[in-house]
Amino acid sequence: MKNIQIIVASDSVGETAELVARACISQFNPKQCESEISRYPYIEALENVDEVISVAKDTEAIVVYTLVKPEIRKYMEAKLAEFKIKAVDIMGPLMNILLDQIDEKPYFEPGLVHQLDEAYFKKIDAIEFAVKYDDGKDPKGLFKADIVLLGISRTSKTPLSQYLAHKSYKVMNIPIVPEVTPPDDLFNIDSSKCIALKISEEKLNRIRKERLRQLGLGESARYATEQRIEEELNYFHELVDKIGCPIIDVSDKAIEETANDIISLIEQNNFKN
């Protein structure tokens, strides 16, 4: 039975090269050959390459490598050729083609694909968080949230939460209603992550009347009266004063503009802390 030694060398974790090696080995009858794969991750210096070459010479191994830094890759190529070691460069050929096609230098940073994966899953977590803790469903989210949005009805709390979630922020929003006591923990969390959303009486009156029309209800419903709106806004300001958090006026702003203002405030507060 043939014994195949494979060395996986990478300036990151080496997962990509190992997957390719295992995919190729799987195409052969295991009764006809044995294979052993050794991984050498984080090849960041020429000495690391020398170690791989030394082992490959002694074991007659095939070297499968993913090296993005040009100086390390060229050194590996030279040493492999010098000692006539069989090898496969997984990334080099495609990188060279892309260099010809794209009028921009690559980053040459190992492990970026894993960083992208982490960023993707962080965003998914944030989106799920926004759904779970929308409209103050569960006060437990207050301590877990990166941002807590406060506002009366029709101040775009939910769309803002979703927009910010796509920027990987975990956002909870709390509706401010005079008849509903806010959760106690709202006064116990760090107020710097709370953002209050303010809207003018006139704008809110127009939005609520339009909402009533869409629902087939009369505009005279208390929900859209000036008295009710003034009552809600007064309660909103009293509550926000107690919390001591910044206020953003959303009256004439698009979701994107408000979201950018929120991110700026949060980043400023994080910098101060």
UniProtKB/Swiss-Prot annotation:
Alphabetical list of InterPro entries matching this protein: Kinase-pyrophosphorylase, PPDK_reg
Organism whose genome encodes this protein: Staphylococcus saprophyticus subsp. saprophyticus (strain ATCC 15305 / DSM 20229 / NCIMB 8711 / NCTC 7292 / S-41)
UniProt-recorded name of the protein: Putative pyruvate, phosphate dikinase regulatory protein 2
EC numbers, comma separated: 2.7.11.32, 2.7.4.27
Coiled-coil blocks: none
Catalytic reaction equation(s): N(tele)-phospho-L-histidyl/L-threonyl-[pyruvate, phosphate dikinase] + ADP = N(tele)-phospho-L-histidyl/O-phospho-L-threonyl-[pyruvate, phosphate dikinase] + AMP + H(+); N(tele)-phospho-L-histidyl/O-phospho-L-threonyl-[pyruvate, phosphate dikinase] + phosphate + H(+) = N(tele)-phospho-L-histidyl/L-threonyl-[pyruvate, phosphate dikinase] + diphosphate
Residues annotated as binding ADP: G151, I152, S153, R154, T155, S156, K157, T158
Pfam families the record matches: Kinase-PPPase
Family: Belongs to the pyruvate, phosphate/water dikinase regulatory protein family. PDRP subfamily.
Keywords, alphabetical: Kinase, Nucleotide-binding, Serine/threonine-protein kinase, Transferase
PANTHER family: PYRUVATE, PHOSPHATE DIKINASE REGULATORY PROTEIN 1, CHLOROPLASTIC (PTHR31756:SF3)
Top-level enzyme category: transferase
Signal peptide positions on this chain: none
Known role: Bifunctional serine/threonine kinase and phosphorylase involved in the regulation of the pyruvate, phosphate dikinase (PPDK) by catalyzing its phosphorylation/dephosphorylation.
Sample GO molecular function, one term: ATP binding
